[in-house]
Amino acid sequence: MVADFKDIKKEDVSVAGGKGANLGEMTREKINVPAGFIVTTEAYKEFLRVNKITDIINNELNKAGNDEKSILNAACYFRKRIRSGTFPAALKNLIGEKYNALGENKKVAIRSSATAEDLADASFAGQQDSYLNIQGMDEILEHIRSCYASLWTDRAVSYRFRQGYDQSRVSIAVIVQEMVESEKSGVLFTVAPINKNENAMLINAAFGLGESVVSGRVSADTYMIDKKTGMIQINIGNKETQIVYDKKGTVERVLSDDKRK
């Protein structure tokens, strides 16, 4: 129910979700990846089973049929049940062992990794929640539970509904990964995402933690790179804020004028 990155490969999406499978593959390729582990989809299923939520989800989805409003109403109930659920002792112990192996009271990111991410015909990335700068077992378990609940947010459910994805098939893993105190962060697309140009890469970057870029909260800088020539097109965004560490997670702060452009 809990796996090290090195034991996961890119084909293991059903076990580790999209992000988890990619982190595992990068680790196997000796790429420098911040340390961590994956609470697998089996752990999510066991959590649902122990808290008697599995049958509730199946029954309510069957009742809702293909009516979006009914599915959303059911999902609201699923979230409440998940948030009030408890972790089985064996799973809690496994998570605790892996967390302690990272170092004493390490600050970590708790990252959702759903099985419906990065499909060929739809992008589910960003539909589930992730949390930064989390510390201590109680907080980790609380935020894993929040990741589980985020599988059933209105946004995630509606997106799956409109993509024609079977709600009963979706599952989620959670990544627990050591935090990196980044002054600047970004996202790299190895294929230009708008025009699907395989000869170009796109980087979106901003100051602070990557949450501001991923969430679209800031107008990030963009760098378009031609793979063949190395030529770069740069567009500097008006970055008004940045997300940085806080004692209890993260906080959004105004960026100084000299860094905005």
Where are these regions (language model features)?
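N-terminal beta-alpha lobe that positions the nucleotide/phosphoryl donor
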Residues: 1-175, 184, 255-258
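Short, glycine/charged-enriched secondary-structure capping and boundary segments
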Residues: 123-125, 190, 203
